[in-house]
Regions:
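Short beta-strand/turn micro-motifs composed of small residues
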Residues: 11, 34, 98
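Short, flexible turn/loop "capping" segments at secondary-structure junctions
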Residues: 43-45, 87-89, 154-157
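Helical element adjacent to the flavin cofactor pocket in flavoenzyme catalytic cores
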Residues: 153-173
Length: 173
């Protein structure tokens, strides 16, 4: 017996599954093919389930911010009742330090600004006020943990950060 499909999607991780799902919602008969034994067993299964909206590319940032809006009402997006046990988006936000190594997030902030992705720039005092378990102290250069100077800070230098309120993580249903 031979099956016919309108689209064969290579991969059954988060991207492949999403492509197959969207095509099927439009009436296409789809088949997802993956080299692993089950959906989501590749890099998707190894992810830490972070939902973030900050990327250095415009396309990456746009795709992530659009996806954020689907996560906000995941059950409706999937066409399910609210009482069905599902993975849930926990919108707790994300703070990223501004460092020389990440060019103080200049490119990321430019992309976020172009797309009206909400963010707040925090000075070092605001970092410690908003997130008391964090420090704005700067550490460096990189040292091995067994180095006696491993935990020494760079005197007189403190880090600001950027907070993205629309970030979070997906729990495990």
């Amino acid at each position: 017996m031979s099956e016919r499909y309108d689209a064969i999607v290579i991969g059954a991780g988060v991207i492949g599954a999403a492509v197959g799902f969207e095509l099927s919602k439009k009436g296409y008969k789809t088949l997802n093919v993956d080299k692993l034994s089950a959906a989501g067993h590749g890099s998707t299964g190894a992810s830490c389930a972070i939902i973030r909206v900050h990327y250095s590319t415009l396309d990456g940032c746009a795709l992530a911010y659009e996806s954020y809006h689907y996560w906000k009402d995941w059950a409706a997006y999937l066409g399910l009742e609210d009482d069905v046990p599902l993975a849930r988006f926990v919108e707790c936000g994300c703070m990223i330090y501004q460092t020389e190594q990440n060019q103080y997030l200049e490119t990321v902030l430019a992309r976020a600004g172009e797309l009206s992705v909400p963010f707040d720039v925090w000075d070092p005092e605001e970092v410690e006020r908003r997130l008391p378990i964090a420090t704005a102290a700067k550490y460096g250069p990189v040292k091995l943990p067994n180095d006696p100077a491993f935990s020494e800070t760079v005197e007189g230098e403190r880090l600001g950060a950027v907070f993205f309120p629309t970030a979070g993580y997906i729990n495990d249903p």
